[in-house]
Amino acid sequence: VLMDLFGNPPFIDESTPTGKVYPRQISRKELFSYVESELKAIESDLKAPKANVYGRADQATAWALLSRLYLNAEVYTGTERYADAATYAERVIASGKYSLHTNYDRLFLADNNLNNPEVLLSVNYDGQRSQNWGGMTFLINSSTGGDAKKATGVNMGVNGGWNGNRATAGLLNLFGGNLATDKRALIKAVGSGEIKSVTEFNEGVYVYKFRNVTSAGANGSNGDHADTDFPLFRLAELYLNFAEAAVRGKADVAKGLTYLNLVRARAYGSAVGNYASLPALTEILAERGREFYWEGQRRTDLIRFGKFTSGDYVWPWKAGVKEGKASDAYRQLYPIPADDIQANPENLRQNPKY
């Protein structure tokens, strides 16, 4: 996360002395190599895929993280590693321990810890035993409120809701004319989905993907704190990682098409949405948007595809304007927090242009 968001963070490891220490700053490329080497070094120490208890990492988790790491290697290091991304995605797939959940929406419900063959690793929440105001409690409560409940008619399983987060029409446009047929479209637009004012919660696109409701329709155990677990890695990601590598000419084309169509078939409930051949990269980006919205992957994907700050791909309120516009490329990284720099001025340097 530090490598992805900040690029060049302060760094400590087991060799760092105890006591008052001013951590050195590590480059993004150096941190990439460190993470890669650590994941490979611990592989034999981890339990086999699906052999660990729910919510704990195993070998498949390490392979999935390596696949994600290699998929973004060109951004992080300047050298592409798409073939390696496909190799480690295939390790997870070939383990045979995971399969796509039949019902997409049940991946994101209060009992998603049960009978879930797709999730490799999750951040676990329990409304009785792990109460906090962040995590899934925030994500679910901030997505709903009085207006949202009226507009969607969907029970979110929470007491009231906080009113706040909603998507722009950009998410709506990803689904195009398939809102009624793509089962991943757990969204509801207010009118056209346009947001005229960012302070108005009754505008835009409501997202009810994550809910504190069980697959049987019962509310979670606590209306103030969510039971829903957050999926960090899903098999669908490994399928789409491989497919992207195939489109980029770095993995088997036939296998990439098969994996892509498995994701599509789950979304549509049949082969009606399947591709006859691998689509263009722009469609892979769109497919990832449809599959992983609200799961924290879109920014990273847009940067990898060169679309996060560019002017050839805009969405409402990009760069802070209603119509959307290009942004400065340096904003692909967040600034190093000022408190960190002030506490460690000799070692830390701010990211360029901040």
Label the predicted regions.
Residues R91-Y239, E244-R248, F308-Y354:
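Elongated scaffold/linker segments in the mid-to-C-terminal portions of large proteins
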